[in-house]
Amino acid sequence: MFLNPMRQFKHAKYLAWIAVLSATSVFAQTANFGKISLAPGFEPGTAIATGSTGGYFSLPSIANRDRHNNFCLGYSGNQTPDHILTLERDFPKLRLQVDSRGTPTTLVVRGPSGTVRCGNTSLEDTDWKAGNYSVWVGAKNEGVQSDYTLSVRE
C-alpha cells in the first residue's frame, strides 16, 4: 500500500505540536519543593511546606511590582517556582508566612490570571481566586541560602 509522504509529514507535525503543548503544561506545574492544595475551611497547621531558598535568580524579573504597587524583591535558586499552591475554590483572604530562623526572606506569588502578589516574610491579601499559584520564596540578599518553613492560613 502506498502512503503519501506529505500526508504523513502533516500528521507528524500535528503530533509534534500536541507533544510540545502537553509538555509545556506539565512543566508549568512543576515546583522545586512541592505542592499545597487547599479548600476553604482547611485545618490550621495543615498547609505547611518546607524548602531552601537563596541563589542568584532575581525575583523582580518575574514582576517589578505587584497588584498593590509593592516592589517585588529577592533572589531564588532559579525561575522554577518553589511551590505550587492550588486553591480548589475562591478564598476571601489568605496569609502566607515564611519562617527562615531569622534570615530575611521575600515572597512572590503569581496567580492563575497572571496577578502578582509580593511581600517580605509574610504576605496577606484578599480576593484569592481558585486555581494554581506559583510561589517563590527568596532571600533578600543575593547568594544567601536558608532553609525555611512556609505556612498558609485563612
Regions found by a protein language model. Name each.
Residues 2-16:
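Bacterial N-terminal signal peptides that target proteins for export
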Residues 5, 27-28:
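Intrinsically disordered, low-complexity regulatory segments
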Residues 18-21:
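Polybasic/polar functional segments that serve as interface/processing modules
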Residues 23-25:
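N-terminal signal peptide c-region/cleavage motif recognized by signal peptidases
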Residues 29-33, 73-144:
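Acidic, Ser/Thr/Pro-rich low-complexity intrinsically disordered segments
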Residues 29-69, 81-85, 130-154:
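C-terminal edge strands of extracellular/lumenal beta-sandwich accessory domains
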